[in-house]
């Protein structure tokens, strides 16, 4: 079973230490009461992976690990079998000892769009909300972050993260916890908080913005990446049953509307840093994620629209500061 003791020890003497008042009991209850029916199968795959320590590790240009001399083809095949037991892989890519995990999302492209607008991450304590497999946590460590904590209630993603960590030598600078942000106390302890691809899944987006704010230190920075629509500060799309085949999409504001929401929640220095149309090169079906992807979610006769007739996915990055 996954042990969180290393994380508890890591935060015991720092600004996150008040979290220890609630977190151990919370995660113990999770282990007893909330495990997914497939969790043991997934975690068994993690346990059967070799504990490898790379001789070359690149977290600045990607997530790439190599070893000299290289691992054997038999080791690589066994490693691939265990990692394939953790499919689908959505956020990546990863390059591990000659094995490439070609994930559904080119999360490295998103990182290239986001990073130029973010305050330097070196030495920072960071929270990544909805972190998925933890790909961006490793990129944050590559930028010199002191500690990168990801939260995501999806238990497969936790197992994917632990698998990658094991193959990166058991690195303790990044951690994933199987929690949603509503389960966190108001820590006010993170220098930077990322929320990427989460806001449109929230029934109450302003509550989500307040939750993010409550995790930041004073003068801390929020990095918010989400779906938007074109329009002025009064424009918000409220999809019907589905948006791009997703059921749980509630509000898609324009970027100016989102800026106004952030200001209404008390953030300052809010800027719209980037906007980009999601392409079928960035999100697509792969050998590591074999179900439907963006190409199937767009109108086959008009790729500027979803199959439901809404504007096709457009994503914005906004940067804001907690005063």
UniProtKB/Swiss-Prot annotation:
Keywords: Transferase, tRNA processing. Its EC number is 2.5.1.-. One of its GO terms (biological process) is tRNA wobble uridine modification. Gene3D superfamilies: Vaccinia Virus protein VP39. GO terms for molecular function: methyltransferase activity; transferase activity, transferring alkyl or aryl (other than methyl) groups. It comes from the Bacteria. Pfam families: Methyltransf_9. It catalyses: carboxy-S-adenosyl-L-methionine + 5-hydroxyuridine(34) in tRNA = 5-carboxymethoxyuridine(34) in tRNA + S-adenosyl-L-homocysteine + H(+). Transmembrane segments: none annotated. Carboxy-S-adenosyl-L-methionine binds at residues 91, 105, 110, 130, 181-182, 196, 200, 315. The keyword DNA repair does not apply. HAMAP family: tRNA_carboxymethyltr_CmoB. Belongs to the class I-like SAM-binding methyltransferase superfamily. CmoB family. Homotetramer. Catalyzes carboxymethyl transfer from carboxy-S-adenosyl-L-methionine (Cx-SAM) to 5-hydroxyuridine (ho5U) to form 5-carboxymethoxyuridine (cmo5U) at position 34 in tRNAs. This is tRNA U34 carboxymethyltransferase. It comes from Yersinia enterocolitica serotype O:8 / biotype 1B (strain NCTC 13174 / 8081).
């Amino acid at each position: 079973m996954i042990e969180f003791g290393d994380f508890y020890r890591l935060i015991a003497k720092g600004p996150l230490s008040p979290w220890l008042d609630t977190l151990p009991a919370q995660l113990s209850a999770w282990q007893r009461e909330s495990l997914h029916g497939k969790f043991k199968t997934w975690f068994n795959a993690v346990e059967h992976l070799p504990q490898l320590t790379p001789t070359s590790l690149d977290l600045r240009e990607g997530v790439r690990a190599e070893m000299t001399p290289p691992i054997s083809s038999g080791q690589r095949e066994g490693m691939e079998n265990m990692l394939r037991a953790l499919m689908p892989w959505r956020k990546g890519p990863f390059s591990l000892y000659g094995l490439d995990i070609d994930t559904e999302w080119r999360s490295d492209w998103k990182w290239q769009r986001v990073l130029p607008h973010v305050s330097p991450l070196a030495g920072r304590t960071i929270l990544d909300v909805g972190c998925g497999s933890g790909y961006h946590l490793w990129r944050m460590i590559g930028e010199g972050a002191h500690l990168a904590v990801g939260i995501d209630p999806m238990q497969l993603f936790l197992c994917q993260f632990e698998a990658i960590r094991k193959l990166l030598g058991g690195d303790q600078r990044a951690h994933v916890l199987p929690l949603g942000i509503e389960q966190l106390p108001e820590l006010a302890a993170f220098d930077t908080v990322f929320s990427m691809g989460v806001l449109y899944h929230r029934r109450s987006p302003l509550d989500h913005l307040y939750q993010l704010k409550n995790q930041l230190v004073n003068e801390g920075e929020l990095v918010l990446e989400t779906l938007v629509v074109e329009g002025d500060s009064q424009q918000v799309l409220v999809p019907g049953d589905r948006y791009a085949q997703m059921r749980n999409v509630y509000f898609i504001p324009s970027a100016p509307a989102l800026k106004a929401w952030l200001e209404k929640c008390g953030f300052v220095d809010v800027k719209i840093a980037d906007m980009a149309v999601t392409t079928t090169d960035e999100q697509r079906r792969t050998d590591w994620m074999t179900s439907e992807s963006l190409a199937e979610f767009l109108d086959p006769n008009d790729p500027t629209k979803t199959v439901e007739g809404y504007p096709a996915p457009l994503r914005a990055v906004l940067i804001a500061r907690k005063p």
